[in-house]
A protein has these predicted regions:
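Glycine/tyrosine- and acidic-biased, solvent-exposed loop/turn segments at the edges of beta-strands
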Residues: 17-256
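Bacterial Sec-dependent N-terminal signal peptides
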Residues: 1-23
Length: 256
């Protein structure tokens, strides 16, 4: 009986010492040491982690009110950078990536609540930069455990810049083209699910500029239009445009 009482007293003393050593501040009033913060009005932990003179250091774990882990952040470089992962309330991984100076950086992966890929994105200074891939919602009946690519695109400082492709769920190409600083540029082509060309459109600074051609499922040209700065030219307007274009070329060749 005496040994049981000693054990209880020892455990209670250890608990008091532990309780007294958390949620402390330094002489400047900044959080320092281990901290455990609870959801307001509850006994459920909201987050726990360690501070060093007001700066998060090492692993922090955040929780939903149901007690499931919401996020994990592992801080380094004096709290400026971190590796982060977020979770659904069913425990499945939601996203994972890196922060540099508290902004998204490098490759981030996003998943749905069943663990299937949603997107894979590249970041720099908090903005999309580089290759980004979106995936179709996972369908276990048809996807055979493999994610199906919806779009592949490239960004520069948050703006679409470079190649772009969009795919049918069967993996065949649906659309392809190029962007320049957020605007469509040059030839954009769409395809039928069979792989045959459907449309061919030319762009300049994000608007139609040049021929727009439509094809049927057999690859035969059905309509052909011509645009300048987003406006369609027809009849006499179109004839005059090509006449002026021809004269400009002749003048340029004579000037050389």
């Amino acid at each position: 009986m005496k040994s049981v009482l000693i054990t209880i007293l020892f455990s209670f003393s250890a608990f008091l010492i532990s309780a007294q050593s958390i949620n402390k501040t330094n002489s400047q009033g900044k959080r320092h040491g281990d901290w455990i913060v609870k959801h307001e009005g509850t006994s459920t932990v909201k987050y726990k982690g360690r501070f060093k003179n007001g700066v998060p250091a090492g692993l922090f774990i955040f929780y939903y009110e149901n007690g499931m882990i919401k996020a994990k952040n592992k801080y380094f470089n004096n709290g400026k950078d971190s590796y982060a992962s977020t979770y659904y309330d069913n425990g499945k991984l939601m996203s994972m990536g890196k922060y540099v100076s508290q902004k998204r950086d490098s490759v981030w992966v996003f998943l749905d609540k069943w663990g299937n890929y949603v997107a894979k994105e590249s970041y720099k200074n908090g903005a999309k930069h580089g290759k980004c891939v979106d995936f179709y919602p996972f369908n276990p009946k048809f996807d055979q455990g493999q994610p199906k690519i919806l779009e592949v695109m490239f960004y520069s400082n948050g703006e679409l810049d470079g190649e772009y492709q969009k795919y049918y769920q069967n993996g065949k190409l649906l659309l392809e083209g190029n962007n320049e600083l957020g605007r469509k540029k040059g030839k954009w082509t769409t395809y039928y699910p069979t792989g045959k060309k459907r449309t061919e459109i030319y762009y300049k600074r994000g608007v139609k500029n040049g021929y727009v051609m439509n094809y049927d499922g057999n690859g035969q040209l059905t309509t052909k239009q011509y645009f300048v700065d987003g406006y369609e030219l027809k009849g006499k307007q179109l004839e005059l445009h090509f006449e002026l274009k021809k004269k400009r070329k002749q003048a340029e060749s004579q000037g050389n």
